[in-house]
Amino acid sequence: MKSSLAVLSTARSDTTTTYIGRNQMIAPMAFQAKRSTFLCPLLVALAILFSLTAVSSGTSWAKDHAGSSQATVSAVAGDNQAVTAKGEVKNSFAPIKTCFNFLKEQPFVFILLALAIGYPLGKISLWGISLGPTAGTLLVGVLISIIGQNIFGIIYGIPSIVSTIFLLMFMYALGLKVGPQFFSGLKTGGLAFIVIGLIVWSLNWLICFFGVKLAGLEAGFAPGIISGSYTITAIIGVAQTALTNGAYTPPPGVSTEQIGANIAAGYAISYVLSNIGIILLIRYLPQIFGHDPIADAQLAEKELSGGATDPVPGAAGSLSLGFSHFDLRAYEVDHQEIIGKTVQEFFHLYPEAPILRVVRQGKLLNLSENNPIKRGDIVSVRADVHELIADGKKLIGKESDSILARDVPIEVADIHIGSRDVAGDTLAELGRSIGFGLQLKALFRFGQELPLLAGTAVQVGDVLRFVGPDFCIQQAAKRLGGRPILNSSITEVMYMAIAMGIGYIFGSLSFNFAGIPFALGTSAGCLLAGIFMSYWRSRNPEFGGPMSEGARSFLQDIGLNLFVAVLAAAVGPKIIESFHGTTAIWVAIIGILGALVPPLVAFVVGIKVFKLNSVVAAGASTGARNSTPGLNAICEQSQSAVAAVPYPLTYALTTVLALVGGYFAMLLS
């Protein structure tokens, strides 16, 4: 038997080696196929956009051509031919205008089109650099809105509540992901995160304010560029407040309306450029300085978890079965030593090989009745494969291929201890009393994983993670006084709605100081709601109902990108309106510098001075820059949400500072 096992292990090893080698050989082919999958629809979409762009210049040329032709023809043959020529030019683009009008009448189609083109566009990699789906969606949405207005005079307007809802869903889903790590992250890097926030805010203000002064731009551009480069629209409102309440007096000959237009222009240009720029910068910051974002993210997760090997209750992957060295085998009972003993008696004799199923004459027996085992019964045992192969015939009988006996579903469940009857029992004692058919996978206390030692005593509030058949799990749950939380695809919407509602209300509360309104912000409020919800679930998995990881991941992904698509429809036309003379160039330069230099400097300080993990430092920097798309970019690049741990702290700090800075930037303009 041992030699057979050795042969089996060797065969598996060879197969694995061959499989890996084959993957290495076909990797370029797989890449080509994957690239083609994205390029085909993308090229078609880009061809359409290119055609529309060509139409824009063609329209301008045609109008000029028609105008000159009209003058010539009217001199020779009258005005009728000129009018006909003009009508033909207009009618030739009618079908395309109809399409753009349709997007205006059906804004939902506008959003879906931006997503459909933006996602594959963001996945295209040139020299190892890609935009990512968020920047791709933003770029496509801006292009469509610009073409629609400048060629056909169509302005797209999508209700702001749409973008607000999707942004809040994204923030809540992100909070659910990082909740258990948030508080441990604050303990280890709180001071560093505050310093990073101060660096980003102060450098942004200095670059934008003095950049406007050096460029000789008019009043109003400074707060507008700060607002756009920081992507905080509320700064515009603060600057407008300084205008309307008389705190700022416009220079002679300059109206408040003109200053308001300058604020809007500075915001529109710098907003889009800084949004795309910060996504690219944050995405590749660790790699720029020689760090592997995936490896660093894994290291950060390990450090923040305190060396725990299992995800905390409620976290992604916490209820996945994973690998187990235990296997299911079925045997036909043939030994007198076993015949006549009940399932429980067999468990006490051989706890390392519990019987999980008994088949008698083709029918399953109810294990709860604890009937004696008879000769010829087929029993299913879950234990170490090697032990079964070596000792199976000696203990039970010959192995059986009965499908009914071997078809035993195995579950993973978290059980919160609610009974004081078991409080103080050691794991060894629990194993003897309730361990039938179960494997203890992990033990958590206050969200922290504890080592599985035989002498460890359990307490009320502890969470035990078991692997085993549903019948065994239910029996253990009754004894422990808890409800087993199993892996589920169902999401409890009630708790999500309540949590998001509380977070929204908390974030919308504001107070005035010296005429400046201060508020945490509804998006940050929903983020904190998600953080606290997952934090409490890590201590009691019964709290908050089930939240499918698939549903959470979908909310995070689609929420942000739908928000960006709606935003693109609004800001696109304003960009073209602001491009005149050298003003637009200066605004673009100052805005990009104000958006990218501060987080770059803060990142360097974080990894060099405070010795922060590169992914955590990137998360702190993007939080200090108030860039949710930037956070999503580093999460995608590192394949982890650990970058979001410092995000709420730096986000909240710099939101307040940026509002104050925007107000004083207007006063000093």
Swiss-Prot record:
Record's bilayer topology term: Multi-pass membrane protein
Cellular location(s): Cell membrane
Domain RCK C-terminal as annotated: residue spans: 316-397, 398-483
Ranges that cross the membrane: 39-61, 124-146, 153-175, 190-212, 221-243, 263-285, 484-506, 516-538, 558-580, 585-607, 645-667
One GO MF term: monoatomic cation transmembrane transporter activity
One family name in Pfam for this protein: Asp-Al_Ex
Protein name per Swiss-Prot or TrEMBL: Uncharacterized transporter DP0386
